């Protein structure tokens, strides 16, 4: 199987998000890469499901709370930006201050 760099990156996000969800299910607080992976994965999948950019920008702020992550992580993540594939093409989705 040959994957393009963009496809490899998406696959890495899926794997990282899966690992983060498993750790979260064990009661662990998420670190920076884990939190970004979960948010990124949900945005990519939301685009695939047909949600709009505006819907995803709003949805991205509901995925994780301060209680879900290690101390200091919310302050480290100012924006999460993902190029996602929508039915009408690829678009940039930006979520500002995703962990509240």
From Swiss-Prot:
Pathway: Nitrogen metabolism; urea degradation; CO(2) and NH(3) from urea (urease route): step 1/1. It is an enzyme of class 3 (hydrolase). Its EC number is 3.5.1.5. Keywords: Cytoplasm, Hydrolase. It catalyses: urea + 2 H2O + H(+) = hydrogencarbonate + 2 NH4(+). The keyword Phosphoprotein does not apply. GO terms for molecular function: nickel cation binding; urease activity. It is found in: Cytoplasm. GO terms for biological process: urea catabolic process. Its main location: cytoplasm. The keyword Cytoplasm applies. It comes from the Bacteria. Heterotrimer of UreA (gamma), UreB (beta) and UreC (alpha) subunits. Three heterotrimers associate to form the active enzyme. NCBIfam families: PRK13241.1, urease_gam. Belongs to the urease gamma subunit family. This is Urease subunit gamma. It comes from Paenarthrobacter aurescens (strain TC1). The gene is ureA.
């Amino acid at each position: 199987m040959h994957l393009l760099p963009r496809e490899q990156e998406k696959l890495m996000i899926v794997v990282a998000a899966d690992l983060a969800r498993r750790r979260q299910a064990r009661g662990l607080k998420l670190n920076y890469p884990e939190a970004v992976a979960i948010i990124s994965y949900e945005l990519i999948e939301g685009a695939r499901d047909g949600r709009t950019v505006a819907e995803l920008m709003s949805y991205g702020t509901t995925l994780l709370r301060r209680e879900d992550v290690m101390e200091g992580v919310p302050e480290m993540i100012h924006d999460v930006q993902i190029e996602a594939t929508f039915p009408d093409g690829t678009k940039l989705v930006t979520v500002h201050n995703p962990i509240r």
